[in-house]
Amino acid sequence: MEEIVVYVHGKDGSAQEAEHYKALFPNCEVIGFDYHAQSPWEATEEFSGFFTAVRKRCGKLTLVANSIGAFLSLSSLNEKLVDAAYFISPVVDMEQLICNMMQWADVSEAELAEKLEIPTTFGETLSWKYLCYVREHPVSWKIPTRILYGEKDALTSMETIKAFTEKNNAELTVMPGGEHWFHTKEQMQFLDNWIKNRRPCNETENKDGFASPAYSSGNRAGADGLRHQKSC
């Protein structure tokens, strides 16, 4: 059975972005997942249903997920559905991100608990339900994963991404000067090379289903306290 690659886009993205990855996975069927979920509780049903159907017709399923698409995948998928994952600028700690946005909007936890939802000037709506959900449903991830992270990512700190990497035994590659959104010619070339240098060609795959990497940032950090409840 063939290998299928499923691409999960980020906010305001499109399943059509999967076209870019067909050249990077030439011997695989590449599918863009046109999902509608806006929250992890919605993604739990939608993502598991879609990936279960795809899993039935392939020998190996590889996930490529971007930004919030990575977080929704983390919240809803497991090793029975996905064999390997590539995360691009992933949101890996939604609780921390929500707390950061509350600080940016000068909203206290008590105020959010009272009002339940508070719109912000930067286009996001703070949700008490969302904050409570991610606290009550910590991510559990056992899938071999490689992460591409921009050094200047404004949504996820270096400390947070390193902690997730260490906790989940993932491989982290950092693009110096890179942003959360990989879109410039230089950034896309870096992204393409990151995938190409890790795709199994004539190399011997390791036990995790990846070829031995041509390069690795080796960025590691302690993960102590990653999942304790944060104070917003």
Which role does the model predict for each range below?
Residues 39-55:
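Alpha/beta-hydrolase active-site loop
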Residues 7-11, 64, 88, 148:
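Short hydrophobic segments within beta-strands
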Residues 2-27, 32, 36:
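Short, surface-exposed "cap/lid" segments of acyl-processing enzymes
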Residues 81-163, 167-201:
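The alpha/beta-hydrolase serine catalytic core
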Residues 76-77:
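Aromatic pocket-lining residues of Rossmann-like dinucleotide-binding sites
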Residues 31-39, 91, 178:
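Short beta-to-alpha linker loops that shape the active-site pocket of alpha/beta-hydrolase fold enzymes
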Residues 205-231:
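N-terminal low-complexity segments that are often proline-rich with Ser/Thr-Pro
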Residues 64-69, 73:
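Gly/Ala-rich beta-loop-alpha elbow adjacent to hydrolase catalytic centers
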